[in-house]
UniProtKB/Swiss-Prot annotation:
The family this protein is said to belong to: Belongs to the ribonuclease III family.
Domain RNase III stretches: 13-142
Swiss-Prot/TrEMBL GO biological process terms: mRNA processing; regulation of gene expression; rRNA processing; tRNA processing
Keyword Magnesium: yes
Species per Swiss-Prot/TrEMBL record: Streptococcus thermophilus (strain ATCC BAA-250 / LMG 18311)
Gene: rnc
Name the record gives this protein: Ribonuclease 3
Length: 237
């Protein structure tokens, strides 16, 4: 999206400072965090680093911070329940949702092929970006900075019960169903109820013309997400 390195870095640094109060000392870490392997591979002669190693580190930092949060927040929950909660919070689709909620997806550097194939919207890439950013933040400023950022962005959504709103279930369902080839996924309103100011929609999701699941929502978009979520649950996601 950004053709010039200076433009990409300047706008990213400005956003981080304005939106989150984060200022990186080691600019190279930030640049690496937002560089996908496809971009690095297309510029091999420049010896550009990609974000996979930072992703590995960020995953560990994320797991630790969320584990501590759950341990303190739910003193009476057994280990098994906390593990399930953590898995839901750090799942790929939710991390991709937080990446988009923060507007980070527009700054990732992708190879031309990856860009053309829709990589900027791919949950796998966006989830990896989130972890890579956390890894870079950890190396630059330590675990307290990672914890502060997550408490600012992720934890409030869990506390408010708005967590599902961050997860893009439609994208997750599409990627799940298209693993073995392209399929036709359609969403159709099959029922509307309630007064004009408080309507509720029933949405059907179908795959290649066959109904897979339905979902309810106070808007068509929310109903689509609910239908996709229900479909994923049926598929055992």
């Amino acid at each position: 999206m950004f053709k010039k390195k200076g433009c990409f870095m300047n706008q990213l640094e400005q956003k981080l400072e304005q939106d989150f109060g984060i200022v990186f000392s080691q600019k190279d870490l930030l640049e690496t965090a937002f560089t996908h392997t496809s971009y690095a591979n297309e510029h091999r002669l420049l010896n550009i680093s990609h974000n996979e190693r930072l992703e590995f580190l960020g995953d560990a930092a994320l797991q630790l911070v969320i584990s501590v949060y759950l341990y303190n927040r739910y003193p009476n929950k057994p280990e098994g329940e906390m593990s399930k909660m953590r898995s839901t919070i750090v799942r790929e689709e939710s991390l991709a949702g937080f990446t988009k909620a923060c507007g980070f997806e527009q700054y990732i550097r992708l190879g031309k092929g990856e860009e053309k194939s829709g990589g900027r919207e791919r949950a796998t890439i966006l989830g990896d970006l989130w972890e890579a950013f956390l890894g870079a933040l950890y190396l630059d400023q330590g675990l307290p900075a990672v914890e502060k950022f997550l408490n600012q962005v992720m934890i409030p959504q869990v506390e408010k019960g708005n967590f599902d709103r961050v997860i893009d279930y439609k994208t997750a369902l599409q990627e799940r169903l298209q693993v073995n080839g392209k399929v036709d996924i359609t969403y159709t309103v099959i029922d509307e109820s309630g007064p004009a100011h408080a309507k509720e929609f029933t949405m059907q999701v179908a795959v290649d013309g066959k109904e897979l699941s339905t979902g309810l929502g106070k808007s068509k978009k929310l109903a689509e997400q609910a239908a996709a979520k229900s479909a994923l649950e049926q598929l055992g996601n």
